[in-house]
Regions:
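Short, surface-exposed loop/helix-turn segments at secondary-structure junctions
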Residues: 14-24, 121-133
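Flexible, small-/acidic-enriched active-site or ligand-binding loops
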Residues: 129-174
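Beta-rich nucleic-acid/ligand-interaction surfaces
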Residues: 2-4, 78, 117-121
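Aromatic-enriched alpha-helical interface/lid elements that frame and gate functional surfaces
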Residues: 34-105, 109
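Active-site-adjacent "lid/gating" segments in soluble enzymes
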Residues: 1-50
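Short, glycine-/Ser/Thr-/acidic-enriched flexible segments
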Residues: 53, 117, 150
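Conserved PLP cofactor-binding pocket of PLP-dependent enzymes
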Residues: 103-125
Length: 174
């Protein structure tokens, strides 16, 4: 139920005719050159989400893009061409180089981190987004409430760790 609720915006778009039921043909599903992920020189990825004009302009400035076609941000007919050009641009540097270029920027461009990198990222460390319990790194509970402290009560079980307990409870022969 909760997952379908997360789709409310998209069903609203679809119902009003501004969302096509085809993958990568819409503003927020990878069709737009300014809202997608791009591979970098090192095979890692960067996320781009520059919808608003000021963020889009900052992206172009930081990327040193002066091509006049990019001024037509919402012209869907040229999105594939602009996406290709951005793809080439992002392939010119490693992900972490791009992350440094956009670090203190409002351009809405961020590195895509893997499961090992995410807990070590300075933003996540400063927000205490992750914790380690019994040698297992995991996200801290969210949202956080000022008067209701949240805690992780146990670590994830290892595969098969509770097979005997479950099989006895449900009278299953292993």
């Amino acid at each position: 139920d909760g997952t379908s609720m997360l789709m409310s915006l998209f069903y609203s778009f679809y119902g009003s005719g501004v969302w096509a039921n085809e993958r990568e043909s819409n503003l927020l599903d990878g069709a737009a050159h300014f809202y997608d992920t791009y591979e970098c020189k090192d095979g890692k990825y960067i996320a781009v989400a520059c919808i608003e004009d000021k963020f889009y302009k900052e992206m172009l400035d930081k990327l040193e893009i002066t091509d006049e076609k990019f001024s037509k941000q919402f012209s869907k007919d040229i999105w594939p061409e602009l996406k290709s050009k951005l793809g080439e641009k992002f392939l010119s540097k490693n992900r972490d180089e791009w992350a440094m270029i956009f670090k203190n920027s409002d351009a809405c461009i961020t590195p895509i981190l893997d499961l090992d990198e995410a807990p070590k990222h300075e933003h996540n460390k400063s927000r205490s987004t992750f914790t380690e319990r019994d040698g297992v790194v995991q996200p801290n509970p969210s949202p956080r409430f000022s008067e209701t402290p949240l805690e992780i009560k146990s670590s994830p079980k290892k595969i098969g760790e509770d097979n005997i307990l479950i099989s006895e409870k449900y009278n299953i022969n292993l």
